[in-house]
Amino acid sequence: MRVRNRPGAAEYMAKYPQYVVEGPEKWQGKWQERFGNNHPIHIEIGSGKGRFIYEMAKAHPEINYIGIDMQLSILSIALDKLVADPLPNLQLLRVDGEALTEYFAENEVDLIYLNFSDPWPKKKHEKRRLTYKNFLATDEIILKPNGEIHFKTDNQGLFEYSLSSFSKYGMIIERVWLDLHNSEFEGNIMTEYEEKFSSRGQRIYRVEARFVAK
């Protein structure tokens, strides 16, 4: 998700180190210590303006959430939500999703959310897709054995690619929704993108895939 540059975003986020983690590599293997409890850790890669991860954290205080995004201005919008209504179980990281092993220890994360990731439709950009095998290999390292990825998109091509990528990697496809908003799925929290696309009548796809413990 791209947004207009927000003047002063860096200075704004620096004022709230209790929410936006500075030097996240020093918390590798110690995220539960950072949260002050032993609750499960769920992360969202590409958390955008933060609606999904914020509402999840609000609905599930028994789980620790971490929203990850590289874009400074957009992460500052997610921070707005925490400043207005603080939650003790949500942290924000401005880091690259390709380098997660620098910030999380092996088997430290319980679940990964991928919501409306960039589809990178051109074949030459396949390696940039967050469901490409190299990203899955990184995800598998930081996830606990039998850890899961929950993936949502409006892009049918990316969805079909991701189902294939999960299967080729050896993951178990637990559940699939080909039209999420017209299904019996309960508790769905919409992202900003999801609300925009669904209001146009676009179908939303969802899958839950699990790594197989080795």
Swiss-Prot record:
EC number(s) on file: 2.1.1.33
CDD domains: AdoMet_MTases
Superkingdom: Bacteria
An annotated GO cellular component: tRNA methyltransferase complex
Pathway: tRNA modification; N(7)-methylguanine-tRNA biosynthesis
Key words of the record: Methyltransferase, S-adenosyl-L-methionine, Transferase, tRNA processing
Residues holding S-adenosyl-L-methionine: 44, 69, 96, 118
Signal sequence bounds: none
GO MF annotation, one: tRNA (guanine(46)-N7)-methyltransferase activity
Catalytic residues (positions): 118
Residue ranges that the Swiss-Prot or TrEMBL entry lists as coiled coil: none
Reaction it catalyzes: guanosine(46) in tRNA + S-adenosyl-L-methionine = N(7)-methylguanosine(46) in tRNA + S-adenosyl-L-homocysteine
InterPro entries registered for this protein in UniProt: SAM-dependent_MTases_sf, tRNA_(Gua-N-7)_MeTrfase_Trmb, tRNA_methyltr_TrmB_bact
Chain spans, region Interaction with RNA: 124-129
Binding site residues for substrate: 122, 154, 191-194
HAMAP family: tRNA_methyltr_TrmB
Its job: Catalyzes the formation of N(7)-methylguanine at position 46 (m7G46) in tRNA.
Record family assignment: Belongs to the class I-like SAM-binding methyltransferase superfamily. TrmB family.
NCBIfam families, per the entry: PRK00121.2-2, tRNA (guanosine(46)-N7)-methyltransferase TrmB
Protein name: tRNA (guanine-N(7)-)-methyltransferase
Name of the gene: trmB
